[in-house]
Amino acid sequence: MNAKSPILVLIAGASGSGKTTFANEIVARIPQNTTSVIICQDSYYISNSQLNKNERRLINYDHPSSFEWDLMREQLSDIKKRKKIKVPIYDYKTEIRLDKTIDISDVDVIVFEGIYAIYDDVINQIADLKVFIETPKDECLIRRILRDVNERNRSFESVITQWRSTVSPMYDQFVEPSKKNANVSVLWNEHNRVALHLINKWINNIH
């Protein structure tokens, strides 16, 4: 087992900004002899299985209070110590947490991505690099519509309603202000390979 402490990279930004794509691109460039994992913050949505489907649809999933922060902090702290963690699995279609989990242990690079990835002081303190993805809001909306309709069993109308009522306001109130915690802000699109190269070079140099 590698005795060196794992590298924790946090990637934040608006819904639909390209956080997951950016995280995947980073991990794809990590050398094969270096173990890595991507953990999605959405896994830590509070389980609301006691509510019916209509009640769950009324929840503001874009507010910080929708996440189980204590578990999130505990597990990220443990994986930084190379301890085994059991990451919850959140089902977007049913909007509840599943009974099964994903076991993760002893990895060299942890990439944690989510809208509030750099929002929490405790998590920020144990992170090695904090990245904020900046993408125009109209592009984020287009990506979210395509994703939620095609992958999450949502209607076009419901996506637009949620964007106007919670996604955009919560971004302005909570997500965008967290940008001040970032070490790096990235203007992200599929052509911005320079940012990927620089971040991966940094990871490889300190690992």
From Swiss-Prot:
It comes from the Bacteria. GO terms for biological process: CTP salvage; UMP salvage. InterPro entries: P-loop_NTPase, PRK/URK, Uridine_kinase, Uridine_kinase-like. One of its GO terms (molecular function) is ATP binding. It is found in: Cytoplasm. It catalyses: uridine + ATP = UMP + ADP + H(+); cytidine + ATP = CMP + ADP + H(+). Pathway: Pyrimidine metabolism; CTP biosynthesis via salvage pathway; CTP from cytidine: step 1/3; Pyrimidine metabolism; UMP biosynthesis via salvage pathway; UMP from uridine: step 1/1. The keyword Lipid biosynthesis does not apply. ATP binds at residues 13-20. Pfam families: PRK. One of its GO terms (cellular component) is cytoplasm. Its EC number is 2.7.1.48. Coiled coil: none annotated. Keywords: ATP-binding, Cytoplasm, Kinase, Nucleotide-binding, Transferase. It is an enzyme of class 2 (transferase). Belongs to the uridine kinase family. PANTHER family: URIDINE KINASE. This is Uridine kinase. The lineage of its organism: Bacteria, Bacillati, Mycoplasmatota, Mycoplasmoidales, Mycoplasmoidaceae.
